[in-house]
Amino acid sequence: MNKALAIVYSTCICAIILCAVLLPGARLSFLLPAAVVCGGILTATYRLACRSFYSTAGEAIIVCVFSLIVCGIILNIWYFTTASGGSFSNPILHNSDSHIDWYYAMEELDGQPHTIFMPNFRYYIYIVMGLCAVFGRDIGVPLMFNALCFGLTIIAVGAITFRLTANRTTSVIAMAATSVMCYLLMEATVLLKDVPLTLCMAVFILGLTQIFIDKKLSFKPIICLMLGIAGVTFLRLNMLLMLFTGAIIFMGRNRNVNATLATVAAVIIVVFVAAKSFMHVPQVAENVLMSDSNPVLNQTRFVRPWDNLLGTPYHEMSIFKRLLWLPASVVVQFLIPFPWNYMRDTIFGPTEAIAHFGYFWYLAGAVFLFWIFRLKKVSNRAMVRLAWWGVFLTVATAFMTSGRVSRYCLPLLPTLLPAVAFTINRKSSRKPLLIWLGVFSVLLCVTLITCYQLQMYPWKFR
């Protein structure tokens, strides 16, 4: 280990210990050893399995980001326990999804009648149950699992980018870009499944691109595809349809590739139908909806200006009207959560504020647009297909949700960030890229100011 890495490791260790001392509430007998083990898994994976694109900078990125997430987890556990009157086994979770997933899983683990109403059954509770059955009933257990998944996601995105570009620097840039996506970073510190889902998406893409580029069937990409499909099945079942479109988009002229991807597509459909048929919601003793029963949530409801502008509830709109609103929905999906609302969601956990500072998210979007208009033609076919798949999924998500749930786009980052990293590392395009970023910054400022006025002073636009 060189001197720079030694400094990084020692600084990160001190930061984690300091947070643990200043913010009591976590079960340190689990959390600190778990941090060491998970950190060791990440560094070992990067050093041993990624030798072709390993770099000291990449390892430093992984260690720093993982340590930052662990500190965020300690902060949130303090908030869920000491600050709110809960405990690590019985935390106070104001986020309805987190509350339902945790307490439903705990009731299932204890074999008790369910007092938590789950509107849409999800297999994710079995992941929470399994982790807590092995490591103890502790909110820190699934959160540390999230931290591990975030680190593995960084490595997977780096591997995808290296597979597409064969350039170590571009791979490190992609890893850095993944690590500064503040929304995804925040998701790793709360009990939500978007980070593991992003990892599953990245693993699936890794297998998909390897088959497309190598044009032959081998053991490693098949394992990646199967792991991705299995993970998505447990985390967000409907997203299997997105994986299905990916298998179709990557079909080409090669018969071996087409046969393999057709088989993968068929497997996805079979798994989707089978998983849907097994879904059920057990009878509950008392239905409890967080949105109705939690007074804190009731007090923090806010008017949605976007819904007001739409006029008609989005789910009642015709397909034609949804298509008319689609460009605006995509823009809203890209812009939210707005920076000035950073205190709005801190009731769910102090780290929620981080999600609102998505300036690197905006930067990545600007660079990706530049890639579409200037560098798409000089990129290889695999990168082009991957990027267009990401665009299709982003637009489809906006169409389904009217752009109101931007976190649904987080698992799509592995489809877009390789093109972003490729653009940043292309020296011949630096000057036009900087000019475009300047123009984009002006347009972004004007748009955000307009959105601020619409949200804060809606009566002015009636």
Feature-to-residue mapping (PLM):
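Transmembrane alpha-helix segments characteristic
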Residues: A6-I16, V65, C224-L225, V378-A398
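Transmembrane-helix motifs of polytopic, lipid-linked glycan transferases
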Residues: G40-R47, M144-L164, V367-W371
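Hydrophobic, aromatic-rich transmembrane alpha-helices
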Residues: T43-A44, G158, S329, Q333-N380
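Extracytoplasmic catalytic/substrate-binding loops of multi-pass membrane glycan-assembly enzymes
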Residues: W78-W102, P113-I127, G136-R137, F338, ...
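Transmembrane-helix signature of polytopic, membrane-embedded enzymes
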Residues: V157-V180
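Membrane-interface helix-loop-helix junctions at transmembrane boundaries of multi-pass membrane enzymes
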Residues: R163, T169, D214-P221, D345-T351, ...
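Membrane-interface alpha helices of multi-pass inner-membrane proteins
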Residues: L185-M186, K220-M239, L243-M251
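Short acidic/glycine- and proline-prone juxtamembrane loop motifs at membrane-interface regions
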Residues: T189-L197
